[in-house]
């Protein structure tokens, strides 16, 4: 029985390019989704507020496009 004179050396392993830290990926994804969700709500709210301010001051082209969305500006005295 022969014994090896040298200990076998391991070849240097390259890191797997398809290894993902799924916890970090999930955290970043949820953070981005939350930011985009809140940004979308902020944009929708800001357009409604902008339209109401413009409607109370004077007739403007931007508000004319919003008039159909606002219940208080319905023809015939609308309102609630």
From Swiss-Prot:
The chain crosses the membrane at residues 24-46. Residues 47-80 are cytoplasmic. O-glycosylated; required for stabilization and translocation to the plasma membrane. Residues 54-80 are annotated as: Disordered. Glycans are attached at residues 3, 5, 9. Residues 1-23 are extracellular. It comes from the Eukaryota. The modification Phosphoserine is found at residue 73. GO terms for cellular component: plasma membrane. It is found in: Cell membrane. Coiled coil: none annotated. Regulatory subunit of the sodium/potassium-transporting ATPase which is composed of a catalytic alpha subunit, a non-catalytic beta subunit and a FXYD regulatory unit that modulates the enzymatic activity in a tissue- and isoform-specific way by changing affinities of the Na+/K+-ATPase toward Na(+), K(+) or ATP. Associates with and regulates the activity of the sodium/potassium-transporting ATPase (NKA) which catalyzes the hydrolysis of ATP coupled with the exchange of Na(+) and K(+) ions across the plasma membrane. Reduces the apparent affinity for external K(+), an effect that depends on the presence of external Na(+) and voltage. Increases the apparent affinity for intracellular Na(+). Belongs to the FXYD family. This is FXYD domain-containing ion transport regulator 7. It comes from Homo sapiens.
């Amino acid at each position: 029985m022969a014994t090896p004179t040298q200990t076998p050396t391991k070849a240097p392993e390259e890191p797997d390019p398809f290894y993902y830290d799924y916890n970090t990926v999930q955290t970043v994804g949820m953070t981005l989704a939350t930011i985009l969700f809140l940004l979308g709500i902020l944009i929708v709210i800001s357009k409604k507020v902008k339209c109401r301010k413009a409607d109370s001051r004077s007739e403007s082209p931007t508000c004319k496009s919003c008039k159909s969305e606002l219940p208080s500006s319905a023809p015939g005295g609308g309102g609630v």
